[in-house]
């Protein structure tokens, strides 16, 4: 194989096997996850202050490894004035400090601008970054940007820099809308994850689900899956959706919250701009594009639209806005719609980095950390290609505790040789003797002992012997 030119130096498996088995026995004790949610598209603004507009990126830390990391750092840090030392010196955290991680965060863009997330991040609590990203580059033709999240303990340890995927940059949407099909990837499809915002000169509010109640909030938001559904579909616990179809104005859609799985009633999505809401659009004619404004009309009452109560500035209730009666005729619009009836549609993406340090905190940053996206077996299942981002030559693949021959191709791809049946049998016996259930899980191990688990499993394929035909 050509990739053998970049074969990764094999890690001493005996040296790491016991530590790896300790991790496999209880991964939740060691895993540290970094969840980064951000918009897939940013909007370019041309004015005196050139900038990119996007909804708030969100950061959530999870996993028991963060508390373990904190205890290790607190015991090893020589600075008594460190924030970690100012916490309780008891080895057992009380209820108030149980979710504290003391990790500070900064968000950066590709042009180097840095803004600080105000408070230390706590477990399972999203920390929000800034809304506006200044782009001082003279090149107004920029097509994409990146977000870089830096996590660190003040004065103690630098966790690393975690990078988003590429964020498309689009110009401010024009009033006119192109007839389908659109040549770029800026159209919404059924099954996409989106956020919905109401923006005006005074405030920006986001559609949010909190404790089962639909509300508007700032800066927090909820993500929704937008589904294409049939107009005659009955509401129920299970809905029949049309996946991967392009969403066009005039179609019937259903919004389902991704966290609490709460769905709004069926609504018709309509074009909206400063001139009003278009009531005459036929489905299949105009695609719904990123960063365009839309209105959602309830099917049960054509005079009822999804909106927000405008009386509260920061936190508002979800309240359908009732218009005076109208007749839906060709070319008719609702003139001067209330601003809280029109929504800015922004595509959203969430990525999760996971790492573990069973041997204690690494001497340096845990990044670049691999982000696993897909895998593909080839050569009759003997090899597998793992695709993603953040791969380095320092990483070697393991299947449970079996070291795999690993070939580094580039930062987005590595190739691994899967173990033989004999190697699997020896590993299964070894793990079961240690009281560990084999999972055939693929993970990457850095040469200093940092583990990056994937969600990919490669169980042994059962071989069915063919019966001789008579």
Feature annotation, model-predicted:
Residues 11, 15, 54-56, 100-102, ...:
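Eukaryote-biased feature marking scaffold/signaling PDZ-domain proteins and nuclear chromatin regulators
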Residues 151-152, 156-171, 259, 266-470:
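Ser/Thr/Pro-rich low-complexity tracts
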Residues 13, 19-55, 62-64, 178-209, ...:
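Beta-strand/beta-sandwich contexts
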Residues 1-7:
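Long, low-complexity intrinsically disordered regions in eukaryotic nuclear regulators
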Residues 22-176, 414-416:
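Beta-strand-enriched, solvent-exposed domains that form extended recognition/catalytic surfaces
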Residues 3, 16-19, 71-74, 161, ...:
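Structured alpha-helical bundle/scaffold domains in large eukaryotic membrane-trafficking regulators
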Residues 7, 14, 173-176:
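Contiguous, amphipathic alpha-helical segments that mediate oligomerization or scaffolding
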Residues 180, 184-321, 326-328:
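Eukaryotic intrinsically disordered, low-complexity regulatory regions
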């Amino acid at each position: 194989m050509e990739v053998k030119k970049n074969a990764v130096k094999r890690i001493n498996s005996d040296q790491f096997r016991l530590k790896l088995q300790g991790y496999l026995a209880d991964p939740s004790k060691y895993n540290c996850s970094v969840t980064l949610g951000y918009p897939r598209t940013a909007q370019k603004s041309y004015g005196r202050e050139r900038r990119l507009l996007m909804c708030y990126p969100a950061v959530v830390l999870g996993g028991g490894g963060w508390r373990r990391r904190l205890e290790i750092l607190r015991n090893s840090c020589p600075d008594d004035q460190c924030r970690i030392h100012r916490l309780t010196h008891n080895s057992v955290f009380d209820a108030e400090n149980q979710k504290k991680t003391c990790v500070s965060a900064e968000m950066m863009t590709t042009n180097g601008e840095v803004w600080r997330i105000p408070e230390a991040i706590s477990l399972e609590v999203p920390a929000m970054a800034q809304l506006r990203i200044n782009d001082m580059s003279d090149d107004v033709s920029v097509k994409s940007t990146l977000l870089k999240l830096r996590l660190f303990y003040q004065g103690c340890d630098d966790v690393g820099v975690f990078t988003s995927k590429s964020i498309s940059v689009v110009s401010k949407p024009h009033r006119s809308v192109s007839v389908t099909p659109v040549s770029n990837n800026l159209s919404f499809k059924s099954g996409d994850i989106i956020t919905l915002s109401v923006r005006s000169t005074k405030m920006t509010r986001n559609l949010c689900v909190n404790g089962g109640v639909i509300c508007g909030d700032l800066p927090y938001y909820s993500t929704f899956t937008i589904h294409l559904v049939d107009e005659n579909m009955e509401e129920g616990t299970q809905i029949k959706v049309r996946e991967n179809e392009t969403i066009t104005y005039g179609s019937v859609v259903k919004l389902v919250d991704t966290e609490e799985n709460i769905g709004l009633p069926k609504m018709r999505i309509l074009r909206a701009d400063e001139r009003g809401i278009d009531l005459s659009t036929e489905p299949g004619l105009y695609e719904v594009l990123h960063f365009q404004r839309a209105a959602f009309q309830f099917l049960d009452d054509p005079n009822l639209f999804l909106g927000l109560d405008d009386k509260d500035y920061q936190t508002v209730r979800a309240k359908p806005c009732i218009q005076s009666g109208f007749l839906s005729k060709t070319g008719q619009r609702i003139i001067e719609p209330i601003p809280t009836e029109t929504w800015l549609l922004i595509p959203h993406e969430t990525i999760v980095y996971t790492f573990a340090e069973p041997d204690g905190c690494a001497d340096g940053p845990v990044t670049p950390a691999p982000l696993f996206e897909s895998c593909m077996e080839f050569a009759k299942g003997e090899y597998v290609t793992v695709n993603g981002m953040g791969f380095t030559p320092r990483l070697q693949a393991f299947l449970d505790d079996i070291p795999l021959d690993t070939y580094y191709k580039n930062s987005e791809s590595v190739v691994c040789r899967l173990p033989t049946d004999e190697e699997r049998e020896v590993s299964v016996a070894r793990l079961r003797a240690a009281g560990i259930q084999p999972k055939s899980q693929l993970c990457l191990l850095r040469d200093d002992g940092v583990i990056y688990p994937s969600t990919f499993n490669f169980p042994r394929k059962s071989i069915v012997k063919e019966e001789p035909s008579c």
